[in-house]
């Protein structure tokens, strides 16, 4: 969602997820700075960029706009799906980001003339920085958030 409250739409046409953006890869890490010998915590957790890969789609120009203008996006929700014991797809985990800056966009087009890349679509790697992140494991409603401007005990 952009800073005016408008949803940035992707090209997914799967029933129930129409207009969302399909993410094919995701990487994010958090590091707790500690003293090497004692393990004593020396600073607040360091959050890396929230990085993901997606196909170039209708959301791409909006993400480029946010990057090039310094626009703050209000929120983004990443939903994780799996196949349950009944063979049905279900959402089981969710990561929500708030007050997001698009910090990098890298486009990639593999050499589609080479056989191994012939069926690969054009993709882009997006990096987000954020002020708040919330992790939500749906089974049991387990939720935790971390924010740059709040202390969590």
Each model region followed by its residue ranges:
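Glycine-rich, low-complexity intrinsically disordered segments
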Residues: 1-153
């Amino acid at each position: 969602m952009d800073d005016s409250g408008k949803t940035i739409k992707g090209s997914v046409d799967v029933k129930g997820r129409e207009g969302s953006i399909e993410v094919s890869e995701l990487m994010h890490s958090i590091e707790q700075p500690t003293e090497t010998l004692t393990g004593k915590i020396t600073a607040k957790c360091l959050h890396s960029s929230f990085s993901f890969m997606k196909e170039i789609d209708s959301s791409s120009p909006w993400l480029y706009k946010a990057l090039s203008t310094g626009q703050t996006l209000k929120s983004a929700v990443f939903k994780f799906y799996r196949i349950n014991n009944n063979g049905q797809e279900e959402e089981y985990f969710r990561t929500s980001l708030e007050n997001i800056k698009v910090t990098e966009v890298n486009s990639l087009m593999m050499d589609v003339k080479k056989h191994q890349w012939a069926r690969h679509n054009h993709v882009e790697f997006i990096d987000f920085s954020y002020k708040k992140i919330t992790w939500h494991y749906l089974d049991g409603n387990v939720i935790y958030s971390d924010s740059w401007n709040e202390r969590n005990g």
